[in-house]
């Protein structure tokens, strides 16, 4: 039986463009906040890492809180779209605040400024915006193929934006005056772009009526399915093993991204050319985009996402191992590093494309086993993973830089720092890919749902 289709091509493209706005925040923040704070503001990377870790203590609570609020929201715009729209206003303001720390403040005040702005951005505004954006996957269509297509469009825009930001930001900062003024101006430009694109994305789609989502028009039944408190929501998530696996996978992916962002330091202090960071960004993002183009076709051909995800991530793991080998062979092997980096990214692409569809399947699993509709709460794993994983990853990089005696005033770093940069950029990404591959090999939620439906 052919599934009903709900979306036009422009709905999918409009939805996907929302991650331009998301990555104007996330790619900019994760790739450059540490080098901005250490080399421009002059803060200690170890202290910055600790502040980020402290900030992350709030994230788990706010993710479930906002996810639950989305599930219980009833408005003319739907459940998720209001949160996506208004949450981004706060994202734009706090993003600028992070990259506009006054240089004439005392250091204690600078640390406090960063902590407050970073916490508000991550624990409040980005949480509301990103969970709502992700939840739309399950709220504007019930067609699994369309959900995969939405994920592919989303991450094509995400990686294209990430590539552009990683390629042009350092040059843009210099062109706009350099130093603190350059970073502040770039942040303002990115925030304005994000606001415009996020607004367009919100109004490019329309949520399905709640009765159609629930397969019932009985309002009392719908209200009963949504009747649970914050503690019960947390229990529903914890009781879904597939949610837990996706959440851990998401966190590991973001830590991976934080380690890859150390490419700015690796290119500067080991390869001797900071512009190579942009070249490596191309080697990562172009293959990812290519993989995303073909992901919907491959999912359809293989009748599901499981085999594709496991096989492609196995390729990624092997390739990251070869990147490490090439890196330790010496800085003259940049070509080999770029080649294996590209192959690894190609292997990571399918999971990025179908991940939101897998989360929708996890939400369906909770519906089939607990008869509770928790779409918004279920998608908290996306925001939680981005913030907790990205924050923890950035914190770890700060701690490791401090432990290895990194000194931003030196043009040549000590051997302890050089060795640590190699571990962060070469070894840890391989180890993380291996763990993710193991988790994906147990992500059999599609099969579980089929068995549950057959038993009804």
Please tell me what each predicted stretch does:
Residues 2-456:
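Membrane-embedded alpha-helical bundles of multi-pass transporters/translocases
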